[in-house]
Amino acid sequence: MTEISQMLEQVYNTMEGSDSSLAYSERHGIEAAAVLTVFDDETAGLVAEHLAPRIAGKTVVEIGGGIGLLALHLGLHAKRVYCIEANPMWSWIFATVLLQSKPKNVSFLFGAADEFLGTVKGDVAIYCTHSDVKGMGLVAAQFAPLVIDVYGELIKAAPESFDQSARALRELV
C-alpha cells in the first residue's frame, strides 16, 4: 500500500460520518462525502488526457478537487488551474501531494467554492465527483462559460460501466 493510500485509509476510518465532519459540513453548507473519485495518478492522468483538447491553454477551475491529483494533471495541459476543495478532511494528504509535485501554474484554494465567486474566473469549470452533483454544476457555471461534469460525460458514454447510484445521480440533474 502506498503512502497516499495509507493516509486515505486513515482519513476514511477516522473522519467519515464523525460528529466533527458532519458539523463542519453543516456549518459551511456543503454536502461532501468522504469518498474520492480521483485517488491515484493513473485515474488523474486518464481524466486529464480526456479533457486535454478542451482545456489546452485555458484557465480551469476545478470544483471539489479532493486531494488535488487531478488538478496537478490538468496543469500539464491548461495555462492555469485553480483547484477548490471545501472538505478539510483531505488536508493531510493534500499537503503531501503538494509538497511532492505542485507546479507554479496550479493553485489550491481551501473553502466552499461559492466563497471564491467574483475572485476566481476561468474559461472552463470542471467537477469530477459523485457528491452533490447538482450543486457542483450550479456553482461551476458561475466560474466559467464552459462546464464539464467529467463523470456525467463518462457515464453517458458507457452507462453499463458505472453502478446504479452513480447513474442515478446524473439522472436527477
Question: Language-model features: where?
Answer:
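S-adenosyl-L-methionine
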Residues: M1-R54
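Conserved SAM-binding loop of SAM-dependent methyltransferases across substrates and taxa
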Residues: I67-H77
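Conserved SAM-binding motif I beta-strand of class I
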Residues: R80-E85
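Conserved SAM-binding loop
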Residues: F94-A95
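Conserved SAM-binding strand-loop segment of SAM-dependent methyltransferases
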Residues: P103-A113
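A short SAM/SAH-binding and catalytic strip from SAM-dependent methyltransferases
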Residues: D123-G135
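C-terminal substrate-binding/active-site "lid" region of AdoMet-derived donor-dependent transferases
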Residues: K134-V173
